[in-house]
UniProtKB/Swiss-Prot annotation:
Record's protein name: Bifunctional lysine-specific demethylase and histidyl-hydroxylase NO66
Substrates-to-products reaction catalysed: N(6),N(6)-dimethyl-L-lysyl(36)-[histone H3] + 2 2-oxoglutarate + 2 O2 = L-lysyl(36)-[histone H3] + 2 formaldehyde + 2 succinate + 2 CO2
Entry note: cofactor: Binds 1 Fe(2+) ion per subunit.
Family affiliation: Belongs to the ROX family. NO66 subfamily.
Annotated keywords: Chromatin regulator, Dioxygenase, Iron, Metal-binding, Nucleus, Oxidoreductase, Phosphoprotein, Repressor, Transcription, Transcription regulation
Binding positions for Fe cation per the UniProt entry: H466, D468, H531
Pfam family, one: RIOX1_C_WH
Annotated GO biological process: behavioral response to ethanol; circadian behavior; negative regulation of DNA-templated transcription
Localization annotation: Nucleus
Originating species: Drosophila willistoni
Length: 767
């Protein structure tokens, strides 16, 4: 058979009208070469063999039939396989176009170890989209056709005044597919950094399904450090009558005037600061490492100085000698700078609102940012309602729009792009810098310092006017937000113990404060102050609200105290146990309130005298009630952030090993000459619970609020004096031999037990 006949035979195996792909053409060429080899073999065999021609023809016919059928099956399978490959290529192209660089079931992170630390293998199995344990089939992401409209996909839409369109400027896309593909363009606007000096911080590699099962639009990140035209007045609120000078404290009613001006150098930052052209200090790093002239010298001396406890260039004591209460005060000073804490508590605390204005846009930028929120949602399992709220306030109506399930960036940013506010309820759980700040401040305030983060798109409001039951410190991180404060509507709302419901605009009077917060500014207002906030037309807002002194009033103390007093009085006073007079019902009660008679007057006077006589608390009862409030603090507090110098002196830096026989070898040993002190001033509390003497402590608390029961250890009454000695000596070190216990062995045992629980620190490292 000549090549032309063979070619005709090959063409018969394929549809002539079908347009062949490159892979099919290659397959046809392979088949053609195979048939040529078969023909050459059969022709040579016919020349050499002397067998019957008829048999040869029959054999050739059968072989030809077999080859033909085999070729058809090969061609069919090849066609299926290559068409499948083509489909896979198309799918992968769509994934790339819709911001995916991997398979649907894969997530990549910049640091896998960080993710492994926060998730167990079971967590990964549970939350993987394609998990075998999942009983719900994931809904495939909605694909838009080429002609469908996507946000910010055309030049005409980009130039239109969309208040919620905050795609960062100066981010140029490369020419090619990414320049025309709307899905790639949207993802690049989310992933690429705002400046070219830093690498991309978002490790997104695929488009995740929205938590509520519907396709949520992705929203580009808002611009950072966006410049505003001086002539533009985009705020939808009524114009202000006055301007506040930069660096001054607001003097709007009812704030008392302050003549104090910030110094030219500004207050020193409580955290080591980098060189900056700004006059005011900025947050750079939430740690207490000493400053160094170069990074090389810092690396060489870091371990030695951590062990020796070197003093930093600011003249502060080394970390292991610092008083945690004073450190918390120092952080508050930095937040309120240039107002001093003493002046703040004298003039503003629980009295008036206070605004601090700064020309320092990066003052709080190290605490949180848009990119940090994006990474936080990727690296940790945050749930709607539990960790994140989606809220809106439009036309006087407040709504919470939380879907169910995990909060992933595409879903959250989709809500944000639609004008919703995002509230993060416990960011300090996931952000070490913010957690360190709160853990230091809680030592000063002697109560939990909570933090919420609020992210609001331009020209939006997420919450209705209301008041809270906390002292609020608003730290403006990014963008601008206009705040209006109102006097409490009722006298009982002053220093309110519970938060209010939502107010309508017609219930409010004229605001006593109406100002715009800019990055670096701070606003304080007492609990019970009615407030509302709205972003300007062309500015988003990112701020932190620090909440302190929740349920920390005299009323809370009396709620603990008076039941104790009453129970003790009943136990020790027989007069309180006597029965009521028989005629009590006929003279007392609401129906007899207007009655004037001697019997009624005598009954009322006797009860009042009985209360004055028997229900006056003793010192011991007041102490016990305060201990109960302190016990609540031990349960609610954030765990302490252990600094390098402290780690070398605590159980957190201890490493155990085994010898050749498997015996455990510890690298520490406390003796009578070992000097010890408490890790923090309020790290523990000695409390009497009924008949038990317990030491409550918060060093082992979870990062989530009250996730576990309160931690405590029971001690003998004879050992309480040793704990009291450590509490009174703080922040000084005392030798174990100074503990008021009879036997040296017992002193060492008590000290070792406290040290092994992370409550004590030694003056000298064991290593």
């Amino acid at each position: 058979m000549d090549p032309e006949t063979l070619d005709d035979l090959v063409n018969e195996l394929f549809d002539k009208k079908k347009q062949l792909t490159v892979s099919q053409k290659q397959q046809r060429e392979k088949l053609q070469a195979y048939m040529m080899a078969q023909l050459e073999g059969s022709s040579s065999a016919s020349d050499d063999d002397d067998e019957d021609d008829g048999e040869g023809e029959d054999d050739n016919d059968s072989n030809s039939d077999e080859d033909e059928s085999g070729s058809e099956s090969d061609a069919t399978s090849a066609d299926d396989s290559f068409s499948s490959d083509d489909n896979d290529d198309d799918d992968s192209g769509d994934e790339d176009g819709s911001d995916s660089g991997g398979s649907d079931s894969d997530l990549s992170f910049e640091d896998d170890s960080d993710y492994e630390d926060s998730h167990s293998t079971e967590d990964l199995t549970e939350y993987t989209i394609n998990s075998e344990n999942s009983s719900v089939e994931p809904t495939p992401p909605k694909r838009l056709k080429a002609g469908d409209k996507r946000p910010c996909s055309t030049q005409e839409e980009e130039e239109s005044e969309d208040d919620n369109n905050n795609k960062p400027t100066a981010r140029k896309l490369q020419m090619g597919e990414s320049a025309t593909n709307g899905r790639i363009q949207q993802r690049k606007s989310m992933v690429e950094p705002a400046t070219t000096s830093k690498p991309a911080s978002c490790p997104l590699t695929r488009k995740s399904l929205p938590a509520n099962g519907s396709a949520a639009k992705s929203c580009p990140l808002p611009p950072k450090n966006q410049k505003q035209s001086a002539a533009a007045k985009s705020c939808p609120l009524p114009p202000k009558e006055k301007k506040l000078s930069s660096g001054a404290v607001a003097k709007s009613c009812p704030l008392p005037p302050k003549n104090e001006k910030p110094s030219s150098s500004g207050a020193s930052c409580p955290l080591p600061s980098k060189t900056s052209k700004q006059v005011q200090p900025r947050v750079c790093q939430l740690s207490d490492k000493p400053k160094s002239s170069s990074s090389q010298s810092t690396q060489k001396r870091s371990k030695n100085e951590a062990a020796e406890g070197a003093t930093d260039t600011n003249g502060r004591q080394e970390a292991h000698r610092q008083n945690s209460i004073e450190e918390g005060r120092r952080i508050l000073s930095w937040v309120l700078n240039p107002i001093k804490p003493d002046d703040f508590f004298k003039d503003f605390w629980e009295k008036n609102a206070c605004q601090v204005q700064r020309n320092a846009p990066t003052y709080f930028s190290e605490l949180i940012s848009f990119e940090m929120i994006d990474q936080m949602m990727l690296k940790h399992h945050l749930e709607f309602t539990t960790n994140i709220d989606v809220t809106s306030y439009k036309d006087g109506r407040r709504e919470t729009l939380n879907p169910e399930g995990r909060a992933m960036p595409p879903t959250v940013w989709g809500f944000y792009g639609e004008g919703c506010s995002i509230r993060i309820l416990n960011p300090s759980t996931y952000l070490p810098g913010l957690r360190t700040m709160c853990s230091l401040m809680q030592e000063f305030f002697h109560c939990l310092v909570g933090a919420n983060v609020y992210l609001t798109p331009p020209n939006s409001q997420g919450f209705a006017p209301h008041f809270d039951d906390i002292e609020a410190f608003v730290l403006q991180v990014e963008g601008r937000k206009r705040w209006r404060l109102y006097m409490p509507l009722q006298p009982s709302d002053v220093l309110a113990r519970e938060s209010s419901g939502n107010y309508t605009p017609d219930q409010l009077g004229e605001p006593i404060f109406d100002e715009v917060l800019k990055p670096g500014d701070v606003l304080y207002f007492p609990r019970g102050t009615v407030h509302q906030a709205i972003t300007e037309k062309k500015h988003h807002s990112l701020h932190i609200t620090l909440s302190v002194y929740q349920q920390q009033a005299y009323a809370n103390l009396l709620e603990k105290l008076m039941p104790m007093v009453l129970q003790s009085a009943i136990k020790h006073s027989v007069s309180l146990r006597r029965g009521l007079p028989l005629h009590t019902w006929q003279h007392l009660g609401i129906a007899h309130g207007a009655t004037k008679c001697s019997s009624r007057s005598q009954l009322i006077k006797g009860i009042q005298e009985m209360v004055q006589q028997h229900l006056t608390p003793s010192e011991n009862q007041i102490d016990a009630a305060v201990d109960q409030l302190a016990k609540r603090y031990q349960h609610e507090a954030l765990p302490p952030t252990i600094l390098p110098e402290e780690k070398l002196r605590t159980v957190f830096g201890s490493r155990s090993a085994t010898d050749a026989h498997g015996k455990c070898l510890c690298d520490y040993e406390l003796t009578e000459d070992t000097s010890i002190r408490l890790l923090r001033a309020n790290i523990l509390r000695l409390v009497v619970d009924e008949t038990h003497l317990r030491v409550y402590y918060y060093v082992d608390n979870a990062l989530e609020y009250c996730k576990y029961e309160a931690n405590f250890m029971e001690i003998e009454p004879t050992e309480a004096a040793a704990v009291e000695t450590l509490m009174h000596a703080y922040p000084a070190y005392v030798k174990i031999s100074m503990l008021p216990l009879r036997k040296p062995e017992r002193r060492i045992e008590v000290a070792t037990a406290l040290w092994e629980r992370g409550l004590l620190m030694t003056e000298t490292p064991f290593k």
